Amino acid sequence: MGVPFFSSLRCMVDLGPCWAGGLTAEMKLLLALAGLLAILATPQPSEGAAPAVLGEVDTSLVLSSMEEAKQLVDKAYKERRESIKQRLRSGSASPMELLSYFKQPVAATRTAVRAADYLHVALDLLERKLRSLWRRPFNVTDVLTPAQLNVLSKSSGCAYQDVGVTCPEQDKYRTITGMCNNRRSPTLGASNRAFVRWLPAEYEDGFSLPYGWTPGVKRNGFPVALARAVSNEIVRFPTDQLTPDQERSLMFMQWGQLLDHDLDFTPEPAARASFVTGVNCETSCVQQPPCFPLKIPPNDPRIKNQADCIPFFRSCPACPGSNITIRNQINALTSFVDASMVYGSEEPLARNLRNMSNQLGLLAVNQRFQDNGRALLPFDNLHDDPCLLTNRSARIPCFLAGDTRSSEMPELTSMHTLLLREHNRLATELKSLNPRWDGERLYQEARKIVGAMVQIITYRDYLPLVLGPTAMRKYLPTYRSYNDSVDPRIANVFTNAFRYGHTLIQPFMFRLDNRYQPMEPNPRVPLSRVFFASWRVVLEGGIDPILRGLMATPAKLNRQNQIAVDEIRERLFEQVMRIGLDLPALNMQRSRDHGLPGYNAWRRFCGLPQPETVGQLGTVLRNLKLARKLMEQYGTPNNIDIWMGGVSEPLKRKGRVGPLLACIIGTQFRKLRDGDRFWWENEGVFSMQQRQALAQISLPRIICDNTGITTVSKNNIFMSNSYPRDFVNCSTLPALNLASWREAS
């Protein structure tokens, strides 16, 4: 959220062997080459012969397009890597480059994305070549034979992503990648796989181009609204009118961001220029894949030059499954609520995060700095570290955690740090109970408990306050047992819908002292001054003042005329970009990039009435003025972007989303629970005594156990927000009793 729920990955410039689906990059390359050689060994028609009729394509043309695609993609990746290394070393990196450094696919994600890039660029090249031969309109994938599509899949490497997946007969713990959670379909919920689609994609050309790509092309008979214009006319409001939420703390917003970073991450392209033409998406407003810039409407309140644009990069494509034709996006993380933001979603990273120097099962901690005697996250060992550039004199690098966005803002870093400390506290206590356990057993048992804690806090404390009691009963009835026919993958639409959290963001980071008074210096730092500022955690008092601020400050209330603050609508990444970004507008552009259907399609999916007229929309929204504004922009409710429509609805009683988002969020979390073999309440995961002990845990108690804070929120930490009324001493909160983890010697 703040940039909460906003994608950002750091680029690792030196890529060693990568794992994806259990195969090293080298193994996958060999398999791909083997597939290509097998194809080349079969007799092929002569090079360059023009097809006699529409529908006949020489396989030689398919192969030459793939080879050309590989050269273009590899060149773009290499140039990008070398350019940013050189600029970071010389200190001349532009703010835009600094930000983009955080958003790259790394390790196994990079391997999976590169294969998909090969495939999509080859199809693009093939279409260009065939267009010069044929005058009639066509979709390139419709004119290729199944055998030729198979050639493309194999020679790109896509066909080999799930080769050789075998699951052990017995498994006590989750895999790091999420692989084998579902024994019948081992890749379901695993990292570096495509999102699931609950409704078919809607692209302008039917398979890849987003609506708004081609000037003049209408959607459902109406012009496509400019995302920035919608943001200006409907989302924008004066910050001094902001309404604080009397029944939600800022921690409610913060848990949403942390949780989102457990569930999904969609990387942006490693190459920041057009593969085919080399146009730079960062500096140019030319629209060529992967650049899909946001156009500026007339009379924009901030950007006066209408020829300018807000930069936007299309999300990385995923290797297609059975349907090679329709573009989908990749989830770099495990879908499951498994604390992957603490432990990682790939094996090499997971090993990197551990302290392997002893048999204590600990996570590695910072060797240079402490926070009042307590551990901080270790620093990442990037050759060129962008966090150093946010405060050149401080020389504080980025942190390393299970999700690469941990340094995005200090509030998020504080939550990562809290869970790191809790893991190490648990591992240490388990060691004293079971002196014979080795480091691996201690690590896995502590990891299992932390994963259960994240599940409990999310489903018991957080989700009821998102959905409200009625939707909670409807979408998340009492847990029965694991069901291996439930698909636990994150839905593409959820990645956009869960950005509802942007409506909760306050424009400041708040820091409070041990009396819950504003902490000097800098008690209220504008959000635009904290992005990527790892130095603020190390040098400005650690995580305690930040956690107090999250507990004792109200979240922003989403109202229909106060949707999102200008700090994220006008000044997002202002310090680190050539132009401040507009997060609500980016959400809308992203839904089009991902081919997500519009508002009414999702209302239909959820069994909700679909308004057709202004009056009907006014009835649904209980706000005719807002309905008129939306219809002015979109022409029809069918075209309203899912995020815009979702956050415009009146909130459900005691919830913080309307009926549509309650359906999408509730449905997703039901699948994540019922389709998880390692769900904490599933029979055989924990003993009955262990489950009873875990039911006592709370986020305030975790804060008590791992910080210098002695007074914390009582009742629900996400609801209480007024000090001292809603606060209690730590001694009144039950601690987790680990007695049932003691093994008989």
Swiss-Prot record:
The residues that cross the membrane are: none
Q: Name one Pfam family in it.
A: An_peroxidase
User: Molecular function terms in GO for this entry?
Assistant: chromatin binding; heme binding; heparin binding; metal ion binding; peroxidase activity
| Cofactor: binding comment | Binds 1 Ca(2+) ion per monomer. Binds 1 heme b (iron(II)-protoporphyrin IX) group covalently per monomer.
Swiss-Prot/TrEMBL cofactor(s) = Ca(2+); heme b
Q: What Enzyme Commission number(s) appear in the record?
A: 1.11.2.2
Record-listed Cysteine sulfenic acid (-SOH) modification sites: C316
Q: Which UniProt keywords apply?
A: Calcium, Disease variant, Disulfide bond, Glycoprotein, Heme, Hydrogen peroxide, Iron, Lysosome, Metal-binding, Oxidation, Oxidoreductase, Peroxidase, Signal
Which branch of life, at top level? Eukaryota
Presence of keyword Cell wall biogenesis/degradation: no
Q: Where does Ca(2+) bind?
A: D262, T334, F336, D338, S340
Swiss-Prot/TrEMBL catalytic activity: chloride + H2O2 + H(+) = hypochlorous acid + H2O
Q: Where does heme b bind?
A: D260, E408, M409, H502
One cellular-component annotation, GO: phagocytic vesicle lumen
Cystine pairs annotated here are C167-C180, C281-C291, C285-C309, C387-C398, C606-C663, C704-C730
Instruction: Work out whether the entry's keyword set contains Transferase.
Output: no
- The record places the active site at H261
Upon changing R569W, the result is: In MPOD; suppress post-translational processing
What is the protein's major site of localization?
other
| Subunit field text | Homodimer; disulfide-linked. Each monomer consists of a light and a heavy chain. Found in a complex with CP and LTF; interacts directly with CP, which protects CP antioxidant properties by MPO.
- Name the disease: Myeloperoxidase deficiency: A disorder characterized by decreased myeloperoxidase activity in neutrophils and monocytes that results in disseminated candidiasis.
Protein name per UniProt: Myeloperoxidase
Q: Which organism is it from?
A: Homo sapiens
